[in-house]
Regions:
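Death-fold homotypic interaction modules
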Residues: 1-98
Length: 98
């Protein structure tokens, strides 16, 4: 694992409590190309059965397993109008939503 990947996973773990109430995971799916169908299915099931807060935790867990998961997540947040959440994760605009 590269050092920046480790840092990205740490950021997701540390900041989850700060954004878990703001994210609706299935709204981000069109922009999260790193997720495989099984990931999306598990996240959607969690969102349907237990709500978006619990589903966000599953989303973060799945993102940490995927290459470029962090970058895709930050870009997806920006594309969906959640700039303030993206800034929590990427305050230096290393990953833009384009």
């Amino acid at each position: 694992m590269r050092s920046y990947e480790k840092l990205e996973k740490q950021i997701l773990d540390q900041r989850l409590k700060d954004f878990q109430y703001e994210v609706i995971p299935d709204e981000l799916f069109p922009f999260l190309r790193c997720l495989i169908p099984e990931d999306k299915e598990a996240i959607k099931a969690e969102q349907t059965n237990r709500g978006p807060i619990k589903a966000t935790a599953v989303l973060v867990d799945r993102l940490k397993r995927r290459q470029k998961g962090f970058q895709d997540f930050v870009k997806a947040l920006r594309k969906c109008g959640s700039e303030h959440t993206a800034l929590l994760l990427d305050p230096n605009y290393n990953f833009r939503g384009k």
